[in-house]
A protein has these predicted regions:
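… and, occasionally, acidic/histidine-rich disordered N-termini of signaling adaptors
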Residues: 86-269, 321-330
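PAS/PAC or PAS-like capping segment
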Residues: 2-3, 154-155, 274-275
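Interdomain signal-transducing alpha-helical coiled-coil linkers
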Residues: 2, 70, 77, 82-95, ...
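HAMP-domain connector/hinge
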Residues: 55, 59-70, 127-128, 140-141
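Active-site-proximal, acidic helix/loop segment immediately C-terminal to a metal-coordinating Asp/Glu
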Residues: 159-178, 262, 266-321
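The cytosolic transmitter module of two-component sensor histidine kinases
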Residues: 39, 66-73, 95, 118, ...
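Cytoplasm-proximal transmembrane signaling helix
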Residues: 2-46
């Protein structure tokens, strides 16, 4: 009887312990499911939304409202993203204003009164890209019988390029008006532009000085695209000569002078790489061959009509692709 009583007591205790374990296990599972549903799942939703936000989707919102804490967290995240979107929009608007300012710097520096004389005619066009570069052209009389002209392209984009363009244009003009030969203009301009050029910007340029009475022209090339020359009874051909180094690229560079004589009805075309490097949606370049072909197919058109026609041809080739570089042309 005693052993039987002890057995019954032990069995009762084991049953009680077993039931307690089952109850606690059931309670634990219930609490886990509740926590997962209320907290973990909601945190997962928030993390998924934050992942999309960090990937750049700022239009998505957090909308977890299971309790006041999650509602407050959702509102805080949405408010932060909204503020970020506003800052981004303001920064984009500021950049657009700066780009427009840079364009105005470019355009205001370019001559727009194109002379028409009995033995000389010049016309130029510069079409700025959205991402402003530093293209420029210039022409001016050095004497009653001498005129200087050039096309140039500054490296870089935005306001720094536009400001460097203004500096280069002013230096070159001042040196040319002092009576220096064209190669010496480039040699001294290079030295001046190298001074305090911590940004490492540089300029490609092609410049000619023409004597209107004799037709003799001296020219220099600082790493620029070769111009095209058409004799009165011939076709356009590239005027390929040995180009010097870019301006502001390195101190101590000296530039060669080239010479040729222009006759009545000869034509000379200067341009920047925005023409030949215009790219279409298939990532193909407009290129030198296509430019030469267009030039010869339209060789008799007056300059004032020719340059817009060439730009239209470039636009047709490019199609829907954006214009990434300035396009500058002078004839």
């Amino acid at each position: 009887p005693v052993s039987e009583a002890m057995f019954m007591r032990d069995a009762s205790m084991l049953t009680s312990v077993f039931m307690q374990v089952i109850i606690f296990a059931t309670l634990f599972i219930f609490i886990y499911i509740l926590i997962k549903r209320v907290i973990i799942n909601n945190l997962q939703k928030i993390n998924d939304t934050l992942r999309r936000i960090t990937q750049g989707d700022l239009n998505v919102t957090v909308d977890v409202r299971s309790n006041s804490e999650f509602s407050s967290l959702s509102d805080d995240i949405n408010s932060t993203v909204s503020t970020l979107k506003r800052y981004i929009a303001e920064a984009a608007a500021r950049i657009d204003r700066e780009l427009e300012y840079a364009k105005q710097i470019q355009l205001s520096a370019l001559p727009t009164n194109f002379p028409e004389k009995e033995n000389f005619e010049i016309y130029a066009q510069m079409i700025a890209a959205k991402e402003v570069g530093g293209d420029f052209y210039d022409f001016y009389k050095l004497s009653d019988s001498t005129v200087a002209f050039l096309a140039a392209d500054v490296s870089g984009k935005g306001i720094p390029a536009a400001m460097f363009m203004m500096t280069a244009k002013t230096i070159i003009k001042d040196l040319a008006e002092s009576g220096l030969p064209v190669n010496e203009v480039f040699t001294r301009a290079n030295e001046k532009l190298c001074e305090n050029n911590e940004s490492g910007m540089f300029v490609t340029a092609w410049m000619g000085i023409l004597d209107l009475t004799t037709g003799k022209m001296q020219f220099a090339n600082a790493g620029h695209n070769p111009p095209l020359l058409k004799r009165a009874n011939g076709e356009f051909e590239y005027l390929r000569t040995r180009a010097g180094f870019v301006l502001a690229g390195m101190e101590g560079v000296r530039y060669r002078v080239g010479e040729l004589t222009l006759s009545p009805r000869d034509r000379l075309f200067l341009y920047t790489d925005g023409v030949t490097e215009a790219t279409n949606t298939e990532n193909k370049l407009y290129g030198e061959d296509r430019l030469l072909s267009f030039m010869n197919q339209n060789a008799t058109i007056e300059a004032t009509a020719f340059l817009p026609a060439l730009k239209a041809n470039i636009d047709e080739f490019v199609g829907e692709a954006p214009q990434f570089d300035d396009i500058t042309m002078l004839m």
